[in-house]
């Protein structure tokens, strides 16, 4: 059985500029097909516009508000919103207030599959 606590995970900055704490991924669990992380973007901040060739992502907004952009389409998001980001989709999220969200990736997240504009 694998149980990880968010508070025990060290934060790091991803290639897109967000602050991440991996909850379950290949570095801390016997994960094969997906990963789960908490992401934070400060008010006024945004992730670098990017896409992933292989992985598909879900974002689930826990706190804050912002604007998600997927292939040029924009929408305001807030707590309780779940966002599907298909493989190959250019995306960025801008925080209009401090954002905290869960990010689930399948297959597991890797810097090598993140392509910046």
Identify the residue ranges that each predicted region occupies:
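Short acidic-glycine-tyrosine-enriched beta hairpin
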Residues: 73-87
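Glycine- and acidic-residue-biased ligand/ion/polar-headgroup-sensing regions
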Residues: 54-56, 60-66
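Ligand-binding loop in jelly-roll beta-barrel domains
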Residues: 87-112
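A short, N-terminal "cap"/entry segment at the start of jelly-roll beta-barrel domains
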Residues: 1-33, 48, 114-117
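Histidine-centered metal-chelating micro-motifs
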Residues: 46-48, 67, 83, 87-92
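Conserved short histidine dyad/triad with adjacent acidic residue
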Residues: 37-52
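A cytosolic small-molecule/anion-sensing beta-strand core signal
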Residues: 62, 78-79, 97
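A generic "binding-loop/recognition-motif" signal
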Residues: 43, 54, 73, 89, ...
